[in-house]
Structure formats: structure tokens, C-alpha cells
UniProtKB/Swiss-Prot annotation:
SUPFAM superfamilies: Adenine nucleotide alpha hydrolases-like, MesJ substrate recognition domain-like, PheT/TilS domain. Belongs to the tRNA(Ile)-lysidine synthase family. The gene is tilS. This is tRNA(Ile)-lysidine synthase. Its main location: cytoplasm. It comes from Salmonella choleraesuis (strain SC-B67).
């Protein structure tokens, strides 16, 4: 193996963060990048090691990585992550935590390099095949992918695991062996330890053939992206919701492709074919007076005003009251709703000395709001302002004593209007 692949993949990258577990693959990657840096003195190279805490050897792995990086004069960042059961399985959760740490560590202008190789590509393809994935899932991994506002590079993706081993032995590299890699209870380990050796014994070039199929699937997806671009433009609103009216006249296949691409744009997990059918039948086609909802993990799909919405699930706060005695400072809201703050300059009057300040999420009675004649109940105001039902009991309402002053970002009541230039604004950082 030469550095030719690295030359191609990293041609324009001069600031590199390498994912470094200390195993064979990432050790070869880091060694290759060190050689690349020697040939290109303007390259800045760092490494990051993720301490998952899953193995009793995790601390010794950190020390090993520190030793290697010190020898190669590569600054090392060690990030410790805490894993909890999120229903996705330990493999998926560890990966999610790992990439979140990568994103948080990247510096401006820096790209992330990871050590996936041809055998990994084959395993990823077969796992997607086992799940019944379509062309998007079977596209597997690309050598370059958008990530955290920059790029994720996989410079070794064309190389086999055997080639990496030969390189490591030839150059006297030392690496660690994660004992969990020998546990074939994990699907990926089962493929690597049992299934792929058997397939390669019969068909030696099986991983390369699978990689070609993945590349063809990716090309088909790019073509579909181009062909459906105008449809997406017609369907997606400036708020990122999906208009239903254009979808009604589409074929099932075309509509499903639009739904998948919309969900991908919202960073949602790719739904199965059955899930797409449920989205259409149970949410999009629900009766007009319904408020349909379909949960996907900690998010949900809703319909409102003939549009589909992808939103984070938040428990209603209808009965919640949050006192705000120090109203001059920001107030943290419950249920991850963010913070509110009263800032100088605005159309709200300041609270009087005898008035207590609080945030609530319901308001009884008839309300009179600035800019509208007559009184109306809060439900009617929400409807007139186009506030979706799920936001109505999570939108902060500012009270002085028992008087409603304002709804964050929606309206000000007559009782809350400032009479001078010393007013304030209610700012909600959701």
C-alpha cells in the first residue's frame, strides 16, 4: 500500500483530525498521515481518542495512544464519553457518542479522517442488506462525506484489512486488540470473523465486488437527487415542513422518494418502507379534524395546515408555573424548552415593584392583544396566529402577578404594553 489514496483524498486538506482508537486500522491511518505531513510541512495533524469506558483495558489504551502520538509528535485529544441505554443497542449508541465527540472537537477549517477500509465497506453493505435497505442504505460509505460543517474523509476505503496488516508489520507498528472484536454476538463481528472469510474463500474478490455495487447504488441515489430536486423545491417550505398538496398526485414510488429526502434533510433516521406507509396513511391522510402524530424515537411527525412537520417530542407543560423572581437574569425553562430573557428595548412594560413575575403555559378567560379589536380566548389566538397545536402548551407565557403580559414571539396583551420608551422584550431561546 502507498500513500496514493491519501494524496487523492486529502489533496486540499491542510488541517486534519484523525480518529485514533489505537487499533490496527487507525494506527495505520495515523502512520500514513504522519508520512503525509512529512511530505507536506504545511499540514497540521491532530489525533482524537474516545474513551468509552466499556472495557477494563480502556485506561491502558489511552496510555498506549499517548505513547504513540508522543513518538510521532501528534497532539492527542482524549475524550471520555458516558454511555446509557437509549434503546438503540450499545454499538449504535457508542458510535453516536463517538461522532458527537468528534464534532465537538473539530477546529475551524479542520477535517476528520477515519480508518474504515474495504472490508468495513463490505460489512456495512451486508448489514444494510440484512435490514432490507434500498439503494440509499446500500450506498454504504463514501470516501468524502459532509460532517459537522466540514468533511469526513476515509482515506483507506479502497484498501483491504490484509493490506493494512502487511503495512503495519512491514513498518514495525504496534497496536492494541479490543477483546470485544472477537465476540461474534455483535453482527459486524459475526460477518468479519465467520461469514466474510467463508465468502472470500470461495470468491477472493468479494469485498471489492460489493464495494462496486455500493458505488453503483450511490450513483443511482445521486441521479435521483438530481431528478427530484425540483419536486423537493416545490414541496418544502421555508420552515422546513413538507407541503402535502403536491404529493397527492404523485405515484407511490415518487412520493416515498420525496418523503425519504425530506426526512434526510431534517437529519431524521431513515424509515423503513412500512414506516413510510404509516406516515402517509396515519398522518398525511388522517381526517381533517384530527391532530395525527407518529413517534420516531425522541421525535415525531405531525400534520398541521396541510403540511408535515418533523419535531422533537416535548411533554406538554399546561399545568406548569415557573417563578421568575430575578427577572433581570435569564430563566431556564423545564423539559428542555430553553431559556427566556427580558432584554431592554421593546413593547412590554417592566413589572411593577409589587408584581411577581412568572412563566406559565396556559391562560384562562378572554384576552385582549395589541393590534386586534375585541377579546378572544387563547385557543382562538393560537389558531389565528397559526401556532401548531403541539406548540400551544410549550410556548412561554409571561405573567405579572395574575395578569398575562405576552406570549413569547407571538403577541403582547394590552395590559402588558409599554407606555414609555423604557420597555423590554421577551426573548425565547428554544
Amino acid at each position: 500500500m502507498t500513500t496514493l489514496t491519501l494524496n487523492t483524498s486529502l489533496l486540499s486538506s491542510r488541517r486534519i483530525l484523525a480518529a485514533f482508537s489505537g487499533g490496527l486500522d487507525s494506527t495505520v491511518l495515523l502512520h500514513q498521515l504522519v508520512l503525509w505531513r512529512e511530505r507536506h510541512p504545511d499540514v497540521t495533524l491532530r489525533a482524537i481518542h474516545i474513551h468509552h469506558g466499556l472495557s477494563p483495558h480502556a485506561d491502558s489504551w489511552v496510555r498506549h495512544c499517548e505513547t504513540v502520538c508522543e513518538r510521532w509528535q501528534v497532539p492527542l485529544v482524549v475524550e471520555r464519553v458516558t454511555l446509557a441505554d437509549n434503546g438503540l443497542g450499545i454499538e449504535a449508541h457508542a458510535r453516536e457518542a463517538r461522532y458527537r465527540a468528534f464534532a465537538q472537537t473539530l477546529l475551524p477549517g479542520e477535517v476528520l479522517a477515519t480508518a474504515q477500509h474495504l472490508d468495513d465497506q463490505c460489512e456495512t453493505f451486508l448489514l444494510a442488506l440484512k435490514r432490507g435497505s434500498g439503494p440509499a442504505g446500500l450506498s454504504a460509505m463514501g470516501e468524502r462525506s459532509p460532517f459537522a460543517g466540514t468533511l469526513l474523509l476515509r482515506p483507506l476505503l479502497r484498501e483491504t484489512r490484509k493490506t493494512l496488516e502487511q503495512w503495519a508489520v512491514r513498518h514495525g507498528l504496534c497496536w492494541i486488540e479490543d477483546e470485544s472484536n472477537q465476540d461474534d454476538a455483535y453482527d459486524r463481528n459475526f460477518l468479519r470473523l465467520r461469514a466474510l472469510p467463508l465468502l472470500q474463500q470461495r470468491w477472493p474478490h468479494f469485498p471489492a465486488a460489493v464495494a462496486r455495487s455500493a458505488t453503483l447504488c450511490a450513483a443511482q441515489e445521486r441521479l435521483l437527487d438530481e431528478l427530484l430536486a425540483s419536486d423537493l423545491t416545490d414541496c418544502i417550505t421555508t420552515e422546513g415542513t413538507l407541503r402535502l398538496s403536491p404529493l397527492m398526485s404523485m405515484s407511490d414510488v415518487r412520493r416515498a422518494a420525496i418523503l425519504r429526502r425530506w426526512l434526510a434533510m431534517r437529519n431524521a433516521p431513515m424509515p423503513s418502507r412500512d414506516a413510510l406507509e404509516r406516515i402517509w396513511q396515519e398522518v398525511a391522510l388522517a381526517r381533517d379534524d384530527a391532530s395525527p402524530c407518529l413517534r420516531f424515537g425522541d421525535h415525531e411527525i405531525r400534520r398541521y395546515q396541510s403540511q408535515l412537520w418533523w419535531i422533537k417530542s416535548v411533554a406538554g407543560q399546561h399545568e406548569t408555573t415557573v417563578a421568575w423572581p430575578a427577572w433581570q437574569t435569564p430563566l431556564a425553562l423545564p423539559a428542555g424548552l430553553g431559556t427566556v430573557q427580558l432584554v431592554p428595548g421593546g413593547e412590554l412594560r417592566r413589572p411593577r415593584e409589587e408584581e411577581s413575575v412568572s412563566i406559565r403555559f396556559k391562560a384562562p378567560g378572554v384576552l385582549h392583544i395589541v393590534g386586534r379589536n375585541g377579546g378572544r380566548k387563547l385557543k382562538k389566538i393560537w389558531q389565528e396566529q397559526g401556532i401548531p397545536p403541539w406548540r400551544r402548551d410549550t410556548t412561554p407565557l409571561l405573567f405579572y402577578g395574575e395578569t398575562l403580559i405576552a406570549a413569547a414571539g407571538v403577541f403582547v396583551t394590552r395590559e402588558g404594553a409599554a407606555e414609555d420608551k423604557e420597555g423590554v422584550s421577551l426573548v425565547w431561546h428554544a
